[in-house]
Amino acid sequence: MKMVLSQRQREELNQAIADYLGTNGYADSLEAFRKEADLSTEAEKKFGGLLEKKWTSVIRLQKKVMELEAKLTEAEKEVIEGAPTKNKRTPGEWIPRPPEKYSLTGHRASITRVIFHPIFGLMVSASEDATIKIWDFETGEYERTLKGHTDSVQDVAFDAQGKLLVSCSADLSIKLWDFQQSYECVKTMHGHDHNVSSVAFVPAGDYVLSASRDRTIKMWEVATGYCVKTYTGHREWVRMVRVHIEGSIFATCSNDHTIRVWLTNSKDCKVELRDHEHTVECIAWAPEAAASAINEAAGADNKKGHHQGPFLASGSRDKTIRIWDVSVGQCLLTLNGHDNWVRGLAFHPGGKYLVSASDDKTIRVWDLRNKRCMKTLYAHQHFCTSIDFHKAHPYVISGSVDQTVKVWECR
């Protein structure tokens, strides 16, 4: 199809070509072109670099078109393959589907953690830019920034009511933030000798657990800010700490390739899980609803060899995800499919699925009962570092080294 330019567009294009020839030293070509196009020898400033600008704009537009075409192809594929619509699928079967609902920008460095508020329509992102940002996940609106840390914020967690937020940082501190009114830091705790990599509230909300590169886990009293216990046993950097919903046990994972399950009220390690072949980056406790799917996948008969749990998922730099029965210290399932480190895990509230985030830039949805990856979302332009699944609303959020936070609608 022949494109027709207006007289003014032709004149601007000719001037831009003349400027390009002149600035790049094509004197003979410039002279011939001016004569052919009937241009004056006086070059106007507004045409300086115009051809290059138009060229790069076209490339950017082409890239956007390709991205949109990929998303459209994905959507068409789902329709052709007869993927059930949101109306036909029960909430227990909803999974995140492309394209993302929102891609949120504002952080100036990698995102380290994303979490949902337990009650309000808010989510929180932590970043290597030393800030914590609050967003409305339903509208995609930015709310506010919490500042106080002086180095990368490594993890954030809410208490059960969402009244307090705890954060930890490479600046060696743990901070408590009022999330009801002031959004101010109300306490700062010090005690670790190295990067504090993870934090979690115990369910009652009166204590916080922290994990550090100094190889220890510490328990802090919220009311006083005092350290009341130190748990030792890991031989390397402790990457993550996550408390079981009942509160009597918690799990940690480490660069020493192990996961440890601890008794909260004592300093005793209940069990050590040792099948990973590299650093264990992340862990997640399975909800009770996942028990039947995990048991079926493990091939356990309901009468004989039934696994009671509790069950824990772990993701590693060995690119695998493992699911454990921590009551007996046994690995029940291994999920293979990621092409790089597994950095984040979250169970579907309905218990049928597990979602994972990886340095291969994807989010994967795993059908636990059938031990297979049922969907791959090409989620980010760089490593995916964190993921969370809302307990009540059909949303998943992810964070990345590409400095974006993405909101995915489940249907």
UniProtKB/Swiss-Prot annotation:
Disulphide bonds in the chain: none
Record carries keyword Transferase? no
For this chain's UniProt record, which GO biological process terms are given? border follicle cell migration; centrosome localization; centrosome separation; chorion-containing eggshell pattern formation; clathrin-dependent endocytosis involved in vitellogenesis; dendrite morphogenesis; establishment of mitotic spindle orientation; germarium-derived cystoblast division
- Main localization of the protein described in the UniProt heading: cytoplasm
**Entries under PROSITE patterns matching the protein:** LISH, WD_REPEATS_1, WD_REPEATS_2, WD_REPEATS_REGION
Identify the keywords attached in UniProt to this record, alphabetized: Cell cycle, Cell division, Coiled coil, Cytoplasm, Cytoskeleton, Microtubule, Mitosis, Repeat, Transport, WD repeat
Q: Where are the WD repeats?
A: 106-147, 148-187, 191-230, 233-272, 275-334, 337-376, 379-411
User: Could you tell me which InterPro entries the record lists for this protein?
Assistant: Dynein_regulator_LIS1, G-protein_beta_WD-40_rep, LIS1_N, LisH, PAC1-like_LisH-like_dom, WD40/YVTN_repeat-like_dom_sf, WD40_repeat_CS, WD40_repeat_dom_sf
Q: What is this protein called?
A: Lissencephaly-1 homolog
Gene Ontology molecular-function annotations: dynein complex binding
List the SMART domains: LisH, WD40
Protein function: Positively regulates the activity of the minus-end directed microtubule motor protein dynein. May enhance dynein-mediated microtubule sliding by targeting dynein to the microtubule plus end. Required for several dynein- and microtubule-dependent processes.
What's the encoding gene here?
A: Lis-1
| Domain comment, as recorded | Dimerization mediated by the LisH domain may be required to activate dynein.
Q: Report the superkingdom from the record.
A: Eukaryota
Domain LisH, which positions?
9-41
For the keyword Transport, the answer is: yes
Q: Which residues form a coiled coil?
A: 56-83
Q: Tell me the protein family, please.
A: Belongs to the WD repeat LIS1/nudF family.
Q: Which GO terms describe its cellular component?
A: axon cytoplasm; cell cortex; dendrite; dynactin complex; dynein complex; growth cone; kinetochore; kinetochore microtubule
